[in-house]
């Protein structure tokens, strides 16, 4: 039983490892003047346009903040 638990932990770590080494995640923000807190879809589109050339699949996460969107995106 103990070997199965260790094997499962190793397997989970192995499956998540490529995400960490595949590309660097960059944190940056975009200022917007339209709303105090923009909605999430607006932030995704704005961050994709600003940092990835419109590629929304490279956006990892966004957080609407006070008159800005905080973006996490993959460098390559």
Swiss-Prot record:
Q: What organism, scientifically named, is this protein from?
A: Scolopendra dehaani (Thai centipede)
- Identify the domain of life: Eukaryota
Q: Which residues form the signal peptide?
A: 1-23
What post-translational modification does the entry describe?
Answer: Contains 2 disulfide bonds.
Alphabetized UniProt keyword annotations: Disulfide bond, Secreted, Signal, Toxin
Q: Name one GO cellular component term.
A: extracellular region
User: Which cysteine-cysteine pairs are annotated as disulfide bonds in the entry?
Assistant: none
Q: Could you identify this protein by its name?
A: U-scoloptoxin(15)-Ssd3b
Taxonomy of origin reads:
Eukaryota, Metazoa, Ecdysozoa, Arthropoda, Myriapoda
- What molecular function terms (GO) are annotated for this protein? toxin activity
Keyword check for Zinc, yes or no.
Answer: no
The text of the family note is: Belongs to the scoloptoxin-15 family.
Q: Where in the cell is it found?
A: Secreted
Q: What is its main location?
A: secreted
Q: In which tissues is it expressed?
A: Expressed by the venom gland.
Q: Indicate whether Disulfide bond appears among the record's keywords.
A: yes
């Amino acid at each position: 039983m103990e070997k199965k638990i260790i094997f499962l932990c190793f397997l989970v770590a192995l499956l998540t490892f490529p995400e960490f080494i595949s590309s660097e995640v960059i944190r940056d923000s975009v200022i917007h003047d339209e709303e105090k807190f923009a909605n999430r879809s607006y932030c995704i589109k704005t961050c994709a346009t600003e940092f990835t050339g419109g590629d929304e699949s490279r956006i990892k996460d966004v957080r609407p903040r006070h008159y800005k969107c905080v973006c996490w995106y993959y460098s390559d």
